[in-house]
UniProtKB/Swiss-Prot annotation:
Belongs to the HrcA family. This is Heat-inducible transcription repressor HrcA. Signal peptide: none annotated. The lineage of its organism: Bacteria, Bacillati, Bacillota, Bacilli, Lactobacillales. Keywords: Repressor, Stress response, Transcription, Transcription regulation. HAMAP family: HrcA (MF_00081).
Amino acid sequence: MLTERQELILKTIIMDFTQSHEPVGSKTVMNQLPVKVSSATVRNEMAALEEKGLLEKTHSSSGRIPSTAGYRYYLDHLINPVKIPASVYNRIIYQLDQPFQQVNEIVQEAAKILSDLTNYTAFAAGPETRSVKVTGFRIVPLSSHQVMAILVTDDGNVKNQIYTLPHHTNGEEIEKAVRLINDQLVGKPLSSVNEVLLKRIADHLVAGGSAPEILDLLQDVIKDAASEQMYVDGQINLLSNYESDDLAKVKSLYKLIDQNDAISSLIGFNPKDEIKNDSKSKVQVKLGSELQSDLLEDYSLLTAQYSVGKYGKGTIALLGPTNMPYSQMIGLLEYFRNELAKKLLDYYGRFK
């Protein structure tokens, strides 16, 4: 652990560096400290912090910058999230106050709002689908070989996909299959639609003389409805925060961000990783080396979970430079997760 004075100096350096992005010298620290300390004392304490691995010296300046370990100490012990200004509050309320038709529209807009407010890359995932129930399934013929499958759930979401059937399927055959499927599916949670239930539906379809391709169609649309959709906004902001001129690395970074499974794994929320100095905070911070990817060594990932009661939990996240202003970003995420949860609860209330 550090002494109280060392903690004060480390916090001062980090707060200055995350605003100016310039190495911080002892004179700057001395002028910003709330207590009077000599320049020599500040220099000695900065040297001690450097020996502990919490500060680093740059080649181009006599000033110091925080190391990854320094940021981690700050996040775990010293940070105080800042309340967002009224202008940001009003902007969030305004942008969330739209006539959304589906949950996914709200979640997608959440990613856009966060990216616009921060100029970072933002992620948003909707609440889990465990409690969502099927309210209807339809197949609409589009041509002699093409149909659209539509699945509706009790949270107002509608999933549809277009399929090409290998042979002509008449309308009567399709309607019969739809009735059989609805008899088995309606009222059941998406999470309960497993292989056993699908096998039972398949047996009914075969016994009724329906085309086996209809079961494949059903499986695809259910898989799509039950999968977690991760929305990403502000990918272009990665370039402004990326210090490498290596085009191949930039392409790899973009590819990583576009991989839904990789991102879902990356921002997987672990309550044990919430910042430790404030029990009320619900924001998790992972620094570059903690993200286990060479592509992200200069970035930090801030993740917050939001709860929509019985409808489950979702996640929002920000990916930005390691020298981001953490107190402001954490304050923003803490506020935004609550407003997003309120908006989703209002939306779900329409279907009671």
